[in-house]
Amino acid sequence: MKIVEVKHPLVKHKLGLMRETDISTKRFRELASEVGSLLTYEATADLETEKVTIEGWNGPVEVDQIKGKKITVVPILRAGLGMMEGVLENVPSARISVVGMYRNEETLEPVPYFQKLVSNIDERMALIVDPMLATGGSVIATIDLLKKAGCSSIKVLVLVAAPEGIAALEKAHPDVELYTASIDQGLNEHGYIIPGLGDAGDKIFGTK
């Protein structure tokens, strides 16, 4: 499995700000979107381009444009919505597919409760967005849904990832790609990432 830890100084700086315990909801939400945008930049670096002739200010000019690769952004509800706008800044024409998952706090297993995928998802590259890759359960279950619907080109974008979640994802879906702003220390006894970000969903939606 391709694993990319994005170590750009801007990513490191913004993620560091997000780790502050008393960060405001507004600021956390802004930073989640900004880091999501930077991760998208990395995740789409291999998109093919083609030469197209357009009408410029001084006549015809040859430019590069993305070659036919359609994209769907797949936020995992609810926290994934906090990264979605940043992703769309880079790929504004992407379609949105939504998957609802929550984690059973006793078993730590994902529980699906909603899904609405674009009709031609089998023709698109899916960018799954979720702030945290902890045990990996929610992301793995989401990939299961996408593959069942015919999607074969899948990339996962997360703010922070635990080694345990990475290992589980690689075992279940070695053909996907993972892009993260940080590979953190690991999980505590409650299944939360250390040092992590706390509850990203609560911080994004102001329910902490």
From Swiss-Prot:
It comes from the Bacteria. Pathway: Pyrimidine metabolism; UMP biosynthesis via salvage pathway; UMP from uracil: step 1/1. CDD domains: PRTases_typeI. Binds 1 Mg(2+) ion per subunit. The magnesium is bound as Mg-PRPP. GO terms for molecular function: GTP binding; magnesium ion binding; uracil phosphoribosyltransferase activity. Keywords: Allosteric enzyme, Glycosyltransferase, GTP-binding, Magnesium, Nucleotide-binding, Transferase. The keyword Magnesium applies. Its EC number is 2.4.2.9. This is Uracil phosphoribosyltransferase. It comes from Escherichia fergusonii (strain ATCC 35469 / DSM 13698 / CCUG 18766 / IAM 14443 / JCM 21226 / LMG 7866 / NBRC 102419 / NCTC 12128 / CDC 0568-73).
